[in-house]
Amino acid sequence: MSIQLLDKTRKINRLLNDKHSSKVAFADICFVLGQMLLANAYIISSKGKLLGTYVNDDGMIPSFQSKQGSYIETMLNERFLNVLSTKENVNLETLGFSKEERQGVEALITPISIGGERLGTLFLCRCQKAFSIEDIILSEYSTTVVGLEIMRSIQEESDIEQHKKSNFSSALTTLTPLEQKAVSYVFHAMGGEDGTLVTSKLAGKIG
């Protein structure tokens, strides 16, 4: 491993060791990667959502949606997901981009997977410079970091949802049978087509 590559991986490591945050921002990873490789960097979820972006050259691929939080086209995301191992210096026409857009643009696609589960894609592109072996190593190292962060986020959301359900169940146990029945009617009414609650009707139904 060259000294330059070692320095670059250490910059990624610093994001993991940031004491000011308990989580790694995908945008920060894109920023660091993009600046080191002089490339546009995009982290895309398996559903096609742009979790993080860094644009080094906003005129490189005009038709590509690059706003963080937005979704890329379904067909494009499917093409990304069909890439099962790192592909360097990809012809953009194979992804559905026009011949004009691919002129002089080199792309690097690295799957984001943990434990055999596909979580997303890292997409890097830049003008007039092919991606090297060291660039590939750095991208694959970065996708490991991103994959672990995605898994952590999924687990965190699951824990929050489970906590909400637990609190709701605990709250129900403090109610009388009649109150529990009333709550049941309320939630049933909230799921109605008009989305409104009529308390007099509820009172009549509950008795």
Descriptions of predicted regions:
Residues 86-96, 139, 195-207:
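Short secondary-structure transition/capping segments
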